[in-house]
């Protein structure tokens, strides 16, 4: 489907036909991989009707070259979603999502969106939140639940994009969107690399080099699990020892606010909860990763 009107009508029809009580939404930009399959699989297991969206959002790309380079693999994406049992796929045009050109009114990410990825990619999260807000509206259940009440509505996001996930949760809370945000854990290859649509652009040597990101995260994670000081500087040194990797940031933050934990939390035995976050360029490819910390 390519129009919001079609999506609304078909989701209402399906919800009624199935006697369903819930609808799930899986927003994507396409170029799907096993991580997206996990999102779809989780949504299908938890909802009566599942909608996936495929839309490469121009508002969140600061570089037109990066936008043009982003892979478009619609046929393969549709096959993956069908295999996971997704009911409806919404793949709108840019004109459908932004009729008349770029929107004059947008969702702004505020201070939470200006740090980390936001500092490296100014305006990225304003564009991302604007399209997520629209997709959440498009994906609203088109009809009532079988028992006549409002159908439950859930949207599924990967934990790899930790800052985006935190911002979407905050937007939904602050603006009273009638949807529950469900985080889905990071999916990794057997050697530990977090799955990403951008991994296809890595050479063999760059892919090997990129493994240092997950190794550094595992080092911090093992120290947290053992209630040891995190000694972040040694993990940073590990990443910086790889010549093909240019580190942007590596820190341990509060999972909700993304504020860095106090320095004494990193140099004394770790207690509590945190999130280790990392971003780096490997060759020309920017990669992000993270690891939840508990003790």
From Swiss-Prot:
Location(s) in or outside the cell: Cytoplasm
Binding site for (R)-pantoate: 60, 164
InterPro entries: Pantoate_ligase (IPR003721), Pantoate_ligase_C (IPR042176), Rossmann-like_a/b/a_fold (IPR014729)
Catalytic activity: (R)-pantoate + beta-alanine + ATP = (R)-pantothenate + AMP + diphosphate + H(+)
A GO BP annotation: pantothenate biosynthetic process
Gene Ontology cellular-component annotations: cytosol
Residues at which beta-alanine binds: 60
Entry annotation: catalytic residues: 36 (proton donor)
Signal peptide region: none
Enzyme class per UniProt: ligase
Pfam families: Pantoate_ligase
GO molecular function, one term: pantoate-beta-alanine ligase activity
Main subcellular location of this protein, as a coarse class: cytoplasm
Pathway listed: Cofactor biosynthesis; (R)-pantothenate biosynthesis; (R)-pantothenate from (R)-pantoate and beta-alanine: step 1/1
EC number: 6.3.2.1
Anything else known: The reaction proceeds by a bi uni uni bi ping pong mechanism.
Subunit structure: Homodimer.
Job description of the protein: Catalyzes the condensation of pantoate with beta-alanine in an ATP-dependent reaction via a pantoyl-adenylate intermediate.
Family of the protein in this entry: Belongs to the pantothenate synthetase family.
PANTHER family cross-referenced by the UniProt entry: CYTIDYLATE KINASE/PANTOATE-BETA-ALANINE LIGASE, PANTOATE--BETA-ALANINE LIGASE
Record-given protein name: Pantothenate synthetase
Protein's gene: panC
